[in-house]
From Swiss-Prot:
HAMAP family the UniProt entry points to: Cytb6_f_cytF
Localization in the cell: Plastid, Chloroplast thylakoid membrane
Binding of heme, residues: 36, 56, 59-60
Protein name per the record: Cytochrome f
Membrane-spanning intervals of the chain: 286-306
A family per Pfam: Apocytochr_F_N
Keywords: Chloroplast, Electron transport, Heme, Iron, Membrane, Metal-binding, Photosynthesis, Plastid, Signal, Thylakoid, Transmembrane, Transmembrane helix, Transport
């Protein structure tokens, strides 16, 4: 009987441990799936719309600068750096999901020409690895190796993100040619204001959904507010929910209008996009150019020598 109870206790403990582990996994996965740039990957087949707009701007409403630096020309089957710069004031703090203030994170999406892709680790030089740091890049889609995403990562450490890119070789990829190609980039700093389902985050302004008198402001136990508005025209009560972390601009008894801001704007981040051009250069063309320049230099040297020889002959004839 005692042995049976022992086995029963062990079975219950194992079941409880599995349940706890599964719960932790689900919570962890959910927090990861809610991170940039997963939203874009889950909801858009291509991050760049036909208009040229990058879809990250649908959630990050403020417009901020972003810059990209790439070489003017690259040779086939070589590795080069694409440096994305996401500048912002490092002293700024953003409202986190729990309502507290914290440092800003950054993220980026890099849209390369077809055939260009993330360089394999064995092709990246030690100097470039040092610039990359501990960043882990991923493809936007398994079949879209030319679109790379990164983030969220700490902005104070990675306001400049170095992408190691492998240029294609037209000799092995017939879909690639020696041409000038565009590169597009999008970069954000800080959290977004809108979730993909259209709901607001706590990193944006909340406006009144009705006009009237504020009859009550209830501070919720876990943070945030419930604001009760009495419509002056019909006496109907409307309750606006304000999430935690936001600063109220209104008070009880105040008369407000429809869409009047109830909170200040906490957003200190924003999204920006840019572009650059890169030329995939034919090595034979480079060799031909070098040969041409060399022949021009040699021709100039021969002309100078010939001129000096002619001057010597003239000088000797005059002396004679």
């Amino acid at each position: 009987m005692q042995t049976r109870n022992t086995f029963s206790w062990i079975r219950e403990e194992i079941t409880r441990s599995i349940s706890v582990s599964l719960m932790i996994y689900i919570i962890t996965w959910a927090s990861i799936s809610g991170a940039y740039p997963i939203f874009a990957q889950q909801n858009y087949e291509n991050p760049r719309e036909a208009t040229g707009r990058i879809v990250c701007a649908n959630c990050h409403l403020a417009n901020k600068p972003v810059d990209i630096e790439v070489p003017q020309t690259v040779l086939p089957d070589t590795v080069f750096e694409a440096v994305v710069k996401i500048p912002y004031d490092m002293q700024l703090k953003q409202v986190l999901a729990n309502g507290k203030k914290g440092a800003l994170n950054v993220g980026a999406v890099l849209i390369l020409p077809e055939g260009f892709e993330l360089a394999p680790p064995d092709r990246i030089s030690p100097e470039m690895k040092e610039k990359i740091g501990n960043l882990s890049f991923q493809n936007y889609r398994p079949n879209k190796k030319n679109i790379l995403v990164i983030g969220p990562v700490p902005g104070q450490k990675y306001s400049e993100i170095t992408f190691p890119i492998l240029a294609p070789d037209p000799a092995t990829n017939k879909d690639v040619h020696f041409l000038k190609y565009p590169i597009y980039v999008g970069g954000n700093r800080g959290r977004g204001q809108i979730y993909p389902d259209g709901s607001k985050s706590n990193n944006t302004v909340y406006n009144a959904t009705a006009g009237g008198i504020i009859s009550k402001i209830l501070r919720k136990e876990k943070g945030g507010y419930e604001i009760t508005i009495v419509d002056a025209s019909n006496g109907r009560e409307v309750i606006d929910i304000i999430p935690r972390g936001l600063e109220l601009l209104v008070s009880e008894g105040e008369s407000i209008k429809l869409d009047q801001p109830l909170t200040s704007n906490p957003n200190v981040g924003g999204f920006g996009q840019g572009d650059a051009e890169i030329v995939l250069q034919d090595p034979l063309r480079v060799q031909g150019l070098l040969f041409f320049l060399g022949s021009v230099v040699l021709a100039q040297i021969f002309l100078v020598l010939k001129k000096k020889q002619f001057e010597k002959v003239q000088l000797s004839e005059m002396n004679f």
